């Protein structure tokens, strides 16, 4: 793409020398840039003044970019840094050589079914990794999918779309293209969960197979109506040669109700793979294998073993975690990673003599060796690459200091890739999920008084009467969406979710001067999917409450509570709430899910750490033994 008029090519933006304009959009401009301090080439996205001045967007972008920067998934373009320079927000990303999927489809037409499935499988892997960390993309579309010459696929713009409300996109007039892939719930007041990304991925699958999005219209109003009420199109009826089995895959992925869609993006990808004929399944596996082999660094040469006597030293680095095949949910990640120790007065240690732009920057957590920068022309920012090597494809001036580590990681990924190919070829039958926990078993899942006392460090806590209905006390919270992050089993929080039963107990020491107080509840849903969807929705709401103070009015009395940062991501989340003027009285909220049961716990006292989380974990263990 040529440098457009009024671009900032040739100028400095903080430490970045802006070398080439890659593209413009409603949210800002993207440049190829040289970081003059680190001496590497990156992609820098500069947000518009309207976005940069929006306090809600600023906070959400920082939070989402920080989370997205931790994603360790090869199909996610990593975010290196974020912050602002002279009041303008920016994101620094790896520069990737590739063409966006939208350009590929417009130039060459529909993909073959095996190639379409190979692309969708890679993007599904990126989405599942993000969803496991509690990150929604919110803008899955062909323009945000990069394809290399060897069909390695990347999903870009994590941390940007998630920070932008649908209302803001609409105001800027940039959502019309996005609306072609937006789930019905995003056009209503319904809660939006990670399954909106699955809907969008199904729309992209349809476009890969047929060459056109599911719904085409000249106006936004017609598009909205189609997503809300229009029949789901059948790819096999649009383009000859598409296996009819894809009709059911797209129909479930684009189901109007979120709970009727696939439980994960990987499940959609696996179903798409099953829709292929046997020869095409092998072809799709070959595409995946070739794309990985061509993109990952070559494995290092084997090093001969040392001749010195063996010692009892522990390995210097832990083994790399296994990559989960498409459609298989990964094991939950640890709910909390200890932060680096702060310096004096809570400040992070850093180099002296930092330039003026440094204090507002937000470096991402270390994630292993930084790969050699490649070229980034994503999200519709550049034309398809021309034949022959790019003029920018030169050896970087600074040598990667971690070649052995990167090579070792490449070996692991290549080996895992081979295992995935074998797994796809064998296609094991999915494990049948456990039967839902019966409502009459709920009370047996709660901790008894001795178990509660042991967790809380007390000896005299006693339970009250069993709770079998939601709390409908006339409580007013200044931020209604934060009520669930403050209290357990609230009727306004669970209303309309489809839950079927609740059982709970409140325990404390006798009298009004108790030092410990616990409210534990278990809530049954018709299916495990509905229970997980509720926890995901709750996690999104809780995270929006982090760092905020709410005023609570209860029986003519007013209280103020401040929320700490939310720890963990579904299936388990926790947050500590501190009551203002209560001499250190705090409560920890914990929510988890196992099978069709949501575990909802509130533990309060003067020395609260992770008691609610411990209680929730013990209840989850009981659910899993049912």
Curated annotation (Swiss-Prot):
It is found in: Cell membrane. Residues 16-276 form the Protein kinase domain. Pfam families: Pkinase (PF00069), PknH_C (PF14032). Keywords: ATP-binding, Cell membrane, Disulfide bond, Kinase, Membrane, Nucleotide-binding, Phosphoprotein, Serine/threonine-protein kinase, Stress response, Transferase, Transmembrane, Transmembrane helix. The active site is at 139 (proton acceptor). One of its GO terms (cellular component) is plasma membrane. Residues 425-626 are extracellular. It comes from the Bacteria. GO terms for biological process: regulation of primary metabolic process. Residues 292-396 are annotated as: Disordered. This is Serine/threonine-protein kinase PknH. It comes from Mycobacterium tuberculosis (strain CDC 1551 / Oshkosh). The gene is pknH.
């Amino acid at each position: 793409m040529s440098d457009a008029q009024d671009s900032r090519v040739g100028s400095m933006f903080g430490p970045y020398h802006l070398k080439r304009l890659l593209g413009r959009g409603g949210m800002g401009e993207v440049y190829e840039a040289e970081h003059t301090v680190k001496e590497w080439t990156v992609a820098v996205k500069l947000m518009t003044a309207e976005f940069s001045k929006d306090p809600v967007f600023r906070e959400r972008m920082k939070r989402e970019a920080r989370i997205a920067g931790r994603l360790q998934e090869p199909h996610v373009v990593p975010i290196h840094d974020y912050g602002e320079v002279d009041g303008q927000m920016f994101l620094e990303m790896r520069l990737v050589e590739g063409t966006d999927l939208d350009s590929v489809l417009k130039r060459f037409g529909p993909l073959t079914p095996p190639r379409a499935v190979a692309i969708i499988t890679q993007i599904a892997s990126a989405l599942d990794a993000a969803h496991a960390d509690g990150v929604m993309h919110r803008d899955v579309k062909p323009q945000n999918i990069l394809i290399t010459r060897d069909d390695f696929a990347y999903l870009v713009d994590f941390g940007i779309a998630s920070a932008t409300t649908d209302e803001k996109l609409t105001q800027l007039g940039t959502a019309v293209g996005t609306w072609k892939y937006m789930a019905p719930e995003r056009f209503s007041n319904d809660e939006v969960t990670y399954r909106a990304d699955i809907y969008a991925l199904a729309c992209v699958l349809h476009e890969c197979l047929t060459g056109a999005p599911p719904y085409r219209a000249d106006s936004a109003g017609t598009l909205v109506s189609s997503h809300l009420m229009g029949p789901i199109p059948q790819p096999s009826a649009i383009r000859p040669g598409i296996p009819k089995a894809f009709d059911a895959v797209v129909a479930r992925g684009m189901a109007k109700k979120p709970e009727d869609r696939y439980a994960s993006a990987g499940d959609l990808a696996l179903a798409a793979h099953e829709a292929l004929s046997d020869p095409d399944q092998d072809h799709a596996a070959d595409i995946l294998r070739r794309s990985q082999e061509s993109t990952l660094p070559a494995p290092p040469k084997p090093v001969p073993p040392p001749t010195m006597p063996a010692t009892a030293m522990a390995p210097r680095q832990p083994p790399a975690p296994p990559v989960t095949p498409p459609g298989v949910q990964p094991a939950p990640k640890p709910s909390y990673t200890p932060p680096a120790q702060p310096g004096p007065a809570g400040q992070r240690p850093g180099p002296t003599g930092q330039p003026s732009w440094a204090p507002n920057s937000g470096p991402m957590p270390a994630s292993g060796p930084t790969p050699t920068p490649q070229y980034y022309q994503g999200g519709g920012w550049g034309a398809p690459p021309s034949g022959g090597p790019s003029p920018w494809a030169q050896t970087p001036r600074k040598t990667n200091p971690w070649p052995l580590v990167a090579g070792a990681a490449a070996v692991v990924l290549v080996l895992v890739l081979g295992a995935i190919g074998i797994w796809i070829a064998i296609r094991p039958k999915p494990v049948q999920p456990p039967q839902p926990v019966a409502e009459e078993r709920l009370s047996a899942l709660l901790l008894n008084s001795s178990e509660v006392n042991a967790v809380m460090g007390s000896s005299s806590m006693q339970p009250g009467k069993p709770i079998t209905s939601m709390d409908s006390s006339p409580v007013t919270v200044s931020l209604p969406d934060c009520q669930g992050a403050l209290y357990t089993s609230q009727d306004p929080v669970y209303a309309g979710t489809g839950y079927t039963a609740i059982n709970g107990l409140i325990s404390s020491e006798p009298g009004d001067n108790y030092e410990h107080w616990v409210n534990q509840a278990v809530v049954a849903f018709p299916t495990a999917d509905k229970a997980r969807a509720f926890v995901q929705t709750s996690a999104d709401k809780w995270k929006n409450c982090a760092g905020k103070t709410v005023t609570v009015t209860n029986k003519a009395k007013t209280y103020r509570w401040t929320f700490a940062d939310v720890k963990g991501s579904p299936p388990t989340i926790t947050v500590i709430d501190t009551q203002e003027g209560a001499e250190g009285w705090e409560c920890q909220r914990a929510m988890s899910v196992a099978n069709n049961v949501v575990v909802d716990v509130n533990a309060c006292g003067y020395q609260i750490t992770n008691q609610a989380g411990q209680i929730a974990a013990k209840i989850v263990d009981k659910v899993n033994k049912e």
